[in-house]
Regions:
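Membrane-embedded alpha-helical bundles of polytopic integral membrane proteins
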Residues: 2-211, 215-223
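Membrane-embedded alpha-helical segments of transport systems
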Residues: 65-67, 175-176, 230-241
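Interfacial loop-to-transmembrane junctions
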Residues: 215-239
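Juxtamembrane boundary at the C-terminal end of a transmembrane helix
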Residues: 240-248
Length: 248
């Protein structure tokens, strides 16, 4: 195993959080989801913005730009308008270099500051926006997605702690989620069609893994808040697209 592979493997499982922490997060979000989609959306916006602000290492003044962009983009999910949300995301991305240049010292590279700000708000914003749109369209699919990610991350946590067959950790962690997905579809516990299991399972597995790898490679020192949400980073938008196209 090369040094790069070891480094990537270590970052892939970086900051998983404790099982109790995962259980509390998933439990609160699921409870809010069943109460009302608006309540869930508001709680999600508050949660991701608080997570980013509390776990960031920068001074308070430096946290304001990414938190502001995060709240702005995440809140558009409450409007249930995908096109408007896409325009807001585009505007936020365009404004990021401007924010990165404000207050930058000569020793700080502009490209590094842009990456730092983007990594601080974009992953969490995509997660909150996707889940907000999803909860407004199909509550059962949103609840199932939260459960799938919970089972995956718990499986990842257990597999890492076992210290056996480390190269198979991503596969072992995925088994529980795919088993839950298959059972839910077969028992009609979700609106997803039975014949959609294979493409959904492939999309879910690839997007979870790709999201964690992307966060691991994005920056040399990703914030803990981003690592905590890395399983959601690409899987939430992909899952939302599956639901929008497969659920009548």
């Amino acid at each position: 195993m090369t040094g790069f592979t070891r480094k990537l493997q270590a970052r892939y499982t970086l900051y998983l959080g404790s099982p109790i922490q995962r259980f509390l997060i998933s439990g609160v979000l699921l409870t809010a989801l069943w109460v009302d989609s608006i309540v869930f959306g508001v709680l999600l916006v508050l949660f991701v913005s608080g997570l980013q602000a509390s776990l960031a290492n920068e001074a308070v003044a430096l946290r304001i730009p990414p938190v502001a962009l995060l709240v702005l983009v995440s809140a558009t999910g409450l409007l249930n308008d995908g096109r408007f949300s896409a325009l807001v995301i585009l505007g936020a991305i365009i404004s990021t270099p401007i924010l990165a240049g404000i207050g930058r010292t000569e020793e700080q590279k502009l490209s590094s500051e842009i990456v730092k700000i983007l990594s601080a708000w974009l992953p969490l914003a995509l997660v909150a926006l996707s889940l907000g749109l999803l909860s407004a369209r199909d509550v059962s699919s949103a609840a199932l997605f939260l459960c799938l990610i919970f089972f995956h991350d718990i499986g990842l946590y257990v597999s890492v702690r076992s210290r056996s067959q480390k190269r198979y950790v991503p596969l072992l962690a995925m088994i529980g989620s795919l088993a839950l997905l298959w059972t839910s579809i077969q028992m009609a516990a979700t609106s997803l069609p039975p014949d959609g299991f294979v493409p959904i399972a492939i999309g879910l597995a690839l997007s979870i893994s790709a999201g964690r790898v992307a966060i691991a490679l994005w920056t040399s020192d990703p914030p803990a808040s981003i690592c905590l949400a890395s399983s959601y980073f690409l899987s939430a938008p992909i899952w939302t697209l599956f639901v929008l196209f497969l659920v009548p």
